[in-house]
């Protein structure tokens, strides 16, 4: 048992509660939290980007979605941790409730849970007479020194809108304000980025906007935020319950007013023409970086996953990337069955017949994240590799070319239905088909998935998103093919022009329509 488990259980006893929810996120509710700031990682040893843990005096449950089923099993100590593998459509709150006794008390950190999640916990667990208690402290957290941010302003020719124009679109009335705590929204509104961060370029802070003024709290001034928000005299402060923490919402008290549709979310996800043009240039550079890496795999022997990752990121810099938009995935053979594998080991040597899955992206001068996935083969593939690759390619082509959709879940259904019917034995598609892209590599809306609120948002022109079907089988391999796309005149267009691997395509499995669709993409 590690020291953090002991700390969690000591907290249960001291506070006289039965359960503690330990989060993967931080005070800004980010998706990709640094491991050094990730309490759930300290508690469980699991390094995935999402997934929370439930602690009781006798058990610890780790809840993970399909991307992390295999990885969680590999990383946790099963003597201490029980991995709960969520399936598509499972609701994590329902799974939490199943593992809690009636008439018990759950403690959560108010600074690491949104108001929306807090209220849903109260509602769901209330059905079992479970009380949810808020705490301002996280007993697992390891405090890290704060580094002053070095901020870069993105020029108008790359954003298409000034900060003032974006704030005016908030349409606030006299003595009204809006609180923005989502880092991507903050970066978008201010046209600022912090390129010194690893795998992200969002600025860190919180801001309040009024009709004619804005108040930004960051670095040293962030400590003044609680006092400001508690004592502000605005009649109304609008908040997005999905992104405001329960702590900040409580501080606002009666001044807080939930908005049904966040105006920043709406304007951020519909890209300007300048942003689209920047994206086209950024993806052309990303394509080149990945294509040269594929050539490196083909032309060199006795290279490792680590060597390929080094070459990949060198190529990104060569073509103008300021940094990576997430931790690059370079996964050979059975490692590619882990959707978010990120070890890139020096010990994993590429051999004849090896598959290499690369999922990567970068940031360029415009501060928008690129994202692409391709699979390469060293030498000649076997029949199963070709069959799985071609099946995934067919799913991509069908989803990319569909015109029968209103929202993201409609496109997801096209690929999912096909893969459910045609996947080779044991191979599964266990994640959403795609996600929005923008300041962050994962932006919402849109989302191409099933049943989430953002997958039901109508798709509009200039929305940008990925299409990334995949098939995975533990101890065998995984195939994922990902293009980042945008909507134009209600048709899906691809930013990505990176070729597909001809050696891995079984053309006998393609019908004439699929061959015609494929002809619009480079195959070599």
Q: What is the predicted role of each segment?
A:
Residues 1-524:
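Active-site neighborhoods and metal-handling regions in enzymes and metal-associated proteins
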């Amino acid at each position: 048992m590690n020291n953090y488990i002991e700390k969690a259980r000591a907290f249960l006893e001291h506070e006289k509660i039965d359960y503690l929810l330990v989060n993967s996120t931080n005070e800004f509710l980010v998706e990709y939290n640094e491991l050094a700031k990730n309490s759930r990682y300290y508690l469980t040893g699991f390094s995935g980007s999402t997934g929370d843990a439930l602690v009781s005096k006798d058990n610890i449950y780790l809840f993970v979605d399909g991307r992390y089923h295999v990885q969680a099993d590999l990383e946790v100590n099963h003597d201490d941790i029980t991995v709960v593998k969520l399936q598509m459509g499972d609701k994590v709150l329902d799974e939490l409730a199943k593992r809690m006794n009636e008439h018990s008390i759950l403690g959560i950190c108010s600074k690491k849970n949104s108001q929306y999640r807090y209220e849903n916990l109260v509602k769901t667990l209330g059905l079992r007479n479970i009380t949810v208690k808020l705490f301002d402290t996280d007993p697992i957290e390891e405090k890290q020194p704060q580094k002053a941010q070095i901020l870069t302003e993105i020029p108008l020719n790359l954003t298409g809108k000034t900060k003032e124009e974006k704030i005016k679109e908030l349409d606030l009335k006299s003595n009204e304000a809006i609180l923005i705590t989502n880092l991507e929204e903050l970066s978008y509104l201010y046209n600022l980025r912090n390129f010194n961060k690893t795998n992200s370029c969002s600025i860190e802070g919180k801001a309040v906007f009024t009709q004619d003024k804005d108040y930004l709290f960051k670095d040293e001034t962030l400590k003044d935020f609680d006092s400001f928000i508690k004592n502000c005299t605005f009649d109304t402060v609008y908040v997005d319950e999905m992104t405001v923490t329960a702590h900040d919402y409580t501080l606002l008290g009666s001044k807080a007013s939930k908005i049904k549709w966040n105006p920043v979310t709406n304007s951020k996800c519909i890209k300007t023409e300048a942003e689209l043009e920047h994206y086209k240039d950024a993806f052309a550079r990303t394509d080149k970086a990945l294509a040269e890496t594929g050539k490196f795999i083909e032309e060199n022997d006795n290279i490792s996953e680590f060597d390929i990752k080094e070459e990949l990121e060198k190529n990104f810099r060569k073509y103008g990337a300021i940094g990576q938009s997430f931790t690059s995935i370079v996964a050979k053979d059975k490692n590619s069955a882990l959707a978010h594998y990120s070890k890139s080991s020096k010990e994993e040597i590429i051999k004849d017949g090896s598959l290499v899955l690369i999922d990567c992206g970068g940031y360029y001068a415009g501060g928008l994240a690129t994202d692409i996935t391709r699979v390469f083969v060293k030498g000649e593939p076997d029949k199963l590799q070709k069959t799985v690759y071609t099946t995934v390619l067919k799913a991509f082509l069908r989803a990319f070319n569909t015109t029968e959709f209103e929202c993201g879940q409609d496109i997801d259904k096209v690929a999912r239905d096909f893969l459910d019917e045609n996947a080779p034995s044991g191979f599964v598609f266990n994640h959403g088909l795609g996600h929005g892209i923008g300041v962050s590599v994962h932006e919402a809306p849109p989302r191409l998935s099933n049943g989430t609120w953002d997958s039901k948002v109508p798709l509009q022109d200039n929305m940008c998103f990925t299409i990334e079907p995949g098939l995975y089988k533990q101890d065998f391999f995984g195939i994922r093919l990902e293009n980042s796309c945008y909507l134009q005149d209600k048709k899906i267009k691809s930013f990505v022009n990176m070729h597909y691997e001809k050696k891995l395509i079984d053309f006998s499995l393609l019908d004439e329509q699929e061959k015609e669709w494929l002809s619009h993409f480079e195959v070599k």
